[in-house]
Amino acid sequence: MNGRILLIIVLMLALLLPLTAAEGETSTLYVRKVENLPEDFIFGMDVSSVLAEERSGVKYYDFNGSEADLFRLLTDNGINYIRVRIWNNPYDDEGHGFGGGNCDIENAVEIGKRATACGMKLLADFHYSDFWADPAKQKAPKAWANLNFEDKKTALYQYTKQSLKAMKAAGIDIGMVQVGNETNGGLAGETDWAKMSQLFNAGSQAVRETDSNILVALHFTNPETSGRYAWIAETLHRHHVDYDVFASSYYPFWHGTLKNLTSVLTSVADTYGKKVMVAETSYTYTAEDGDGHGNTAPKNGQTLNYPVTVQGQANAVRDVIQAVSDVGEAGIGVFYWEPAWIPVGPAHRLEKNKALWETYGSGWATSYAAEYDPEDAGKWFGGSAVDNQALFDFKGRPLPSLHVFQYVDTGTPFKN
């Protein structure tokens, strides 16, 4: 009799195990509900490096521990938009890639096809450079280096239109196009705002002619700088720049308070009738380095208002979503930057990692990028600088913080 009871108990426990595992997966995370999120709010991710990662042998897994397609896993966890950066020609004369995912138009087309196959829209992020474009550098592509301004403007228009044509021909669902990346003070080598505005309009024209339903976004950063976004928005208005979305980067350890972010985005939205969003954000879940190449955070002097934990990471993402939502109807979404840029191998096998970074471009830069970007990539080339800000651990297993995009609509009923 005791044996039969024991057997029944064992069987009942076995039946409960899947439920217990699922509960355990979610109960480690607390997410406070964001009220009144619209159904079409963008939960986006930039996974520009994923093809280079996969070619380097990186694998991703679902919450059950089974190997999974990254795009299917993301859409199953609430992601509805994929962002991909596009560089004109990120290769040297011998065809060696500059790294950072070697993000040419072919890379964008493949990522776009996989995103579309999983029901997600694509944000095409044109840098109009052969490598990273950001506030520190906006270098023109090699092929445009000796063009006069009018020819450069024509080249930008044609390149944008041809690239979008290739993506449309591949059946990609393009929802938005970014004309430039973090263009605080430059675009394709131009720093005068009158000329930059003409370049913005050349890109915008190419988008409008391709598909009038595609949103045109312009992207800036450093919202913490007093008056910056008000000045930029007024300058764009004065130069009659045609765009729909004013996009901002927001990294909690660099870019000030969320209250300020909401305030400056609200001002742009209310004054000029623009949609607004966060095009890039991320946060650390560990201070550990996974691949032997140093990370951008945490570092001395940075403001870390959240714990460096998985829960802290989830809180940071949730609060950015809240900040954009607080703008009102004009606040359309948030993109997480490179959540899957994890180590190609452990830190203790650094030399093997270096070989993979050089061969497949799966680090932030290769040594070959030195000819184009000698002062930055030429000195600091290597692996992923954000593996500790990913939403996957160093072995490709999803962190509970990946669930935050699903939970913000409902919240979780418990707090640890």
State the predicted function of each range.
Residues 69-71, 213-215, 228-302, 309-312, ...:
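Glycoside hydrolase catalytic-domain groove-lining segments
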Residues 97, 102-107, 133-237, 241, ...:
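Active-site cleft segment of glycoside hydrolase catalytic domains centered on the general acid/base Glu
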Residues 28-29, 267, 286-318, 323, ...:
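Aromatic-rich peripheral "rim/lid" segments of glycoside hydrolase catalytic domains that contact
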Residues 45, 74, 125, 177, ...:
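Conserved, mostly hydrophobic/aromatic
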Residues 8-18:
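Bacterial N-terminal signal peptides
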Residues 66-133, 193-214, 261-271:
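Aromatic-lined substrate-binding rim segments of carbohydrate-active enzymes
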Residues 23-79:
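N-terminal carbohydrate-binding accessory modules
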Residues 47-50, 87-89, 127-131, 179-184, ...:
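Active-site beta-loop-alpha junctions enriched in small/polar residues
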